[in-house]
C-alpha cells in the first residue's frame, strides 16, 4: 500500500482510499477500534501519503456486516465518530463512507453522511467526506433495486444528497474499473442528474 501511494504520487494522483473488504476494522468488525499495532500500520500509511502527496483516506463500511440501522443509529454514530477520532489522532485527514455492494435505505445513508460531514467540518482540517453509494457505476444502476421500501437509484441518491453539497459522491463510470472518457461524464450528467 505504501508503494502504491509512492507510485501514485509519482503520477500526480492525489488520494489513496484504504477500503479493503477483507480488513476487519473497515468492514466486518467496523464497530471495533484498532489495536495499537494495527493503528501504527495506519499511521505509517498516513505518513507515506503525506510524503508522496498521495493523501491516505480511510474508509468504513458499516452497511455490509452487522449493518447500522435506524434502531441502532445513535449508538453506532458514536462508535463511528470514536473510530474517526482514533484515526484522526494518527493523522488521517480524509474519511470515506462505503455503502457499495450492500443493502440499506438511501435516507439512512444520507443521514449518516450529514452527521459525519458535520464532524469533519468541526475538525477544521479534514477534507470533504467521500461517499460510495450502492449505485456507484452504470452497471450498478442495472443491479439497483428496492431496499426497505426505497428505490436504490442514482436519482434517489441525488434527491437525498441535495442538501449535502460538500459530500463527494463516488462514481466509477460505466463499470467498476473503467477508463475516464468524456462520453462517460456526459452520459452520467444527462442520464442520471437531469443535466446538473
What are these regions (language model features)?
Residues 1-5, 11-19, 54-55, 97, ...:
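Aromatic-enriched hydrophobic runs in primary sequence
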Residues 1-85, 89-93, 121:
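Feature activates predominantly on carbohydrate-active enzymes
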Residues 28, 102-196:
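Catalytic-core regions of glycoside hydrolase
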Amino acid at each position: 500500500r505504501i508503494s502504491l501511494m509512492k507510485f501514485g504520487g509519482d503520477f500526480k494522483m492525489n488520494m489513496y482510499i484504504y477500503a479493503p473488504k477483507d480488513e476487519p476494522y473497515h468492514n466486518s468488525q467496523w464497530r471495533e477500534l484498532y489495536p495499537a499495532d494495527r493503528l501504527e500500520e495506519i499511521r505509517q500509511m498516513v505518513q507515506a501519503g503525506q510524503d508522496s502527496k498521495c493523501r491516505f483516506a480511510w474508509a468504513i463500511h458499516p452497511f455490509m456486516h452487522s449493518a447500522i440501522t435506524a434502531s441502532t443509529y445513535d449508538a453506532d454514530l458514536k462508535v463511528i465518530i470514536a473510530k474517526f477520532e482514533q484515526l484522526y489522532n494518527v493523522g488521517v485527514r480524509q474519511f470515506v463512507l462505503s455503502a457499495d455492494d450492500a443493502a440499506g435505505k438511501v435516507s439512512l445513508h444520507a443521514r449518516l453522511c450529514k452527521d459525519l460531514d458535520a464532524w469533519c467540518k468541526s475538525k477544521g482540517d479534514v477534507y470533504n467526506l467521500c461517499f460510495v453509494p450502492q449505485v456507484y457505476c452504470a452497471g450498478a444502476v442495472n443491479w439497483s433495486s428496492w431496499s426497505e421500501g426505497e428505490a436504490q437509484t442514482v436519482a434517489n441518491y441525488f434527491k437525498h444528497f441535495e442538501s449535502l453539497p460538500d459530500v463527494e459522491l463516488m462514481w466509477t463510470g460505466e463499470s467498476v474499473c473503467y477508463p475516464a472518457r468524456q462520453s462517460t461524464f456526459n452520459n452520467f450528467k444527462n442520464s442520471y442528474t437531469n443535466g446538473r
